Structure formats: structure tokens, C-alpha cells
Amino acid sequence: MKPLLIFDLNGIFLVRQRGATSHKPDFTIGAFKCYVRPGVRRFLKWAHHHFDVAVWSSTMPHNTIPIVKYIWGKKMKDLKFIFSQRHCTQTGTMPCGKPIFLKELKYVWEMFPWYDETNTFLIDDSPHKVVNNPPHTSIHPEPLTFETRHVPIDLKNHLSHLQPL
């Protein structure tokens, strides 16, 4: 069995920008202009070859699904699951009024018992979202921002050592 990689979306594969910008987005969802990081599709082809792949975003479902459809296209069917905000645990609210969410892997392991803390890795740019998970079950790359949106994805080095022998 392949290890499971669970990817966040915003900050990993794309950046969402609200409001006016002179830069043409790759696609738009509601008020958000979305910019996909270069090399994402090539990286995902590699990831799907070596790992089981899933998505867990803290965005609302009506935003999560269109983003996944855009990034994965017809390969969306190869995802083991797609979790959204409704699968997160809300723990409070930021001063700006935005909710604070956790991504608790115990829910993944309850639904998919063949995965556990030895073969599951959550890739998320927000370390605070995984504080209730066992150690060594998450990787936190530098977040993609509007200013760095042209920087190609570079996660293979982080993930190559996780591949089964």
C-alpha cells in the first residue's frame, strides 16, 4: 500500500486574491482570482504515481470542489477523498472574525482505517491547523503568496523519502 499524502490547496498549489488586480488569473471562483503555481500538474502526476493522494482544504465546499476540478481536471477521480471546511474542527475565531480550523487526522483514520500515523502525511502551509495530530504526520512548506505565485512547486525533495521501498 502506498502512503497517503493529503494536500491543502491555498498556499500550496495556488493563491487566491480578492479584489482588483491587474494580473490575469488562471481562473476565478466568486470574488476570488486564483493563480496556480507553475509545475503543479507535473508534480501531481509524480505524486499520484508514488502515493495515494487526497485533498483537505479549509475552504467552503462550494469553493473547494471548483478548485480541485481546475487543478486536477479529469484526474480528480484519482483522489482518495476531498475534504473541505465541513471536515475541519472549528476552535475559535481570529481577531478579524475569520474562523480558526484544525485538520484532525483521527477523522481520516476513522473513515479509512488502512491509513494511520505511520503512512499518512498532511501537506499544509498552516502549522496551527495540525496541532492535535501525532508528531511527524505533517509537512509545512513555505506558503505561496501573491508575490511568490510564479515560484514553481518544489515538494519532491520533502516527499521522496516517504515513498515505499
Model-derived regions, located:
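Alpha-helical substrate-recognition element adjacent to the catalytic core
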Residues: M1-C96
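C-terminal cap/substrate-recognition subdomain and adjoining C-terminal extension
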Residues: I65-L165
